[in-house]
Amino acid sequence: MRFLALVAAPAKADDESMTNETAARGRDPIALSDALASFDALWSPRIVTRVNDYDVRVAKVEGEYLWHVHENTDEFFLVVEGEVDIALRDEAGERTVTLPRGSVFTVPRGTEHKPIARGRASILLFEPTGTLTVGDRHEEIPDYVDATTGHALA
């Protein structure tokens, strides 16, 4: 199995004028560790930057998400910290993939899936801008899940 190493350079601490907007346009680097340290909410992704028509989001996760499906788009996961399982349901049946730190996985469009983090973990997601975190179809949304298209970094 091949793993993707992710190393983020720290943002310039002396540049108080840096905003999410300028960072999102590629003017300044964004340290993923700083982005993740800027919020505490679980299952509530923050938009780190945009690439063409895609959001690059980070989220802190723990426990179970909910079964959901994105009918028209794949969903890319990269585990930044911790370990995440993704339960999958499709025509072939049900299975679970385990993603240790540094692993990537793409859930194909139309595949029901449910991320699960048995301990605290952090993930990075690539999704088309405006994609709802709970997909197009989903089970009942628990109170701890933020149904959103992503929040701006603080």
At which residue positions do the language-model features occur?
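Short histidine-centered beta-strand/loop micro-motifs
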Residues: 47-48, 59, 66-71, 87-89, ...
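A cytosolic small-molecule/anion-sensing beta-strand core signal
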Residues: 52, 80-81, 100-101, 119
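Short secondary-structure boundary/capping segments within folded domains
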Residues: 38, 47-51, 67-70, 76-78
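Ligand-binding loop in jelly-roll beta-barrel domains
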Residues: 109-139
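Short, conserved beta-strand element in jelly-roll/cupin
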Residues: 60-61, 70-86, 90, 126
